[in-house]
């Protein structure tokens, strides 16, 4: 169903903007706090000539969801998520099959949203696990990655809090309040 020649109602607004050079939709995206999404959507408009062209964006989104699943596997492993290999394999599959994530794969206009979740995860990992970088570099890089994630779609940027929860609360290690404080500063 993902790789078919169909479009949802919002996909047609993208189609309309692409074929009639209607920039109000781009302006709306920027004004609603999604400037990177607006830029990506503007670039994407150059590739849309008909409904079957939405397939390309669904493929990009599905590949992003697959990448998200792989990232989640390695993140859960590093965070020592309880349940071992079985939990590390099953949990990413279940999370990537949530209706909202599945919608990102089916709805062409949502093509960068799964990437936004990946950016939030990369932000969290950079802040807490890139020990080769100096602390200030990790902090700045993390803030930039999270800002990019929010600039695509704010709700997916909030996935930073999910990574924070998994790493700090859903494992057998003790809470590290300094780490939690840094995480809260970045997300604030």
Language model regions located:
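Membrane-interface alpha helices of multi-pass inner-membrane proteins
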Residues: 138-154, 159-160, 165
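Juxtamembrane "helix-exit" motif on the non-cytosolic side of transmembrane helices
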Residues: 2-5, 44-49, 77, 97-107, ...
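Membrane-interface micro-motifs in multi-pass membrane enzymes
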Residues: 34, 86-128, 151-156
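Extracytoplasmic catalytic/substrate-binding loops of multi-pass membrane glycan-assembly enzymes
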Residues: 2-18, 28-40
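Perimembrane helix-loop-helix junctions
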Residues: 159-188
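Short hydrophobic/aromatic helix or loop-helix immediately within or flanking a transmembrane segment
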Residues: 28-55, 59
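Membrane-interface transmembrane helices that cradle and orient dolichyl/undecaprenyl
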Residues: 120-139, 173-175
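Transmembrane-helix motifs of polytopic, lipid-linked glycan transferases
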Residues: 59-81, 122-126
């Amino acid at each position: 169903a993902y790789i078919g020649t169909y479009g949802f109602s919002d996909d047609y607004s993208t189609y309309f903007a692409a074929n009639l050079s209607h920039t109000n939709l781009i302006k709306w995206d920027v004004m609603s706090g999604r400037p990177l999404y607006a830029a990506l959507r503007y670039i994407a408009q150059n590739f849309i000539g008909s409904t079957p062209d939405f397939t390309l964006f669904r493929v990009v989104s599905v590949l992003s969801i697959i990448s998200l699943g792989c990232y989640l596997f390695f993140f859960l492993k590093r965070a020592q998520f309880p349940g071992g290999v079985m939990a590390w394999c099953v949990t990413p599959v279940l999370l990537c099959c949530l209706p909202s994530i599945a919608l990102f794969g089916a709805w062409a206009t949502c093509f960068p949203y799964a990437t936004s979740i990946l950016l939030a995860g990369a932000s969290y990992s950079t802040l807490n696990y890139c020990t080769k970088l100096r602390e200030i570099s990790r902090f700045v890089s993390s803030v930039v990655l999270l800002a990019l994630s929010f600039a695509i779609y704010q709700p997916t940027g909030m996935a930073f809090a999910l990574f924070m929860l998994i790493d700090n609360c859903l494992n057998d290690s003790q809470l590290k309040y300094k780490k939690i404080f840094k995480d809260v500063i970045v997300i604030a």
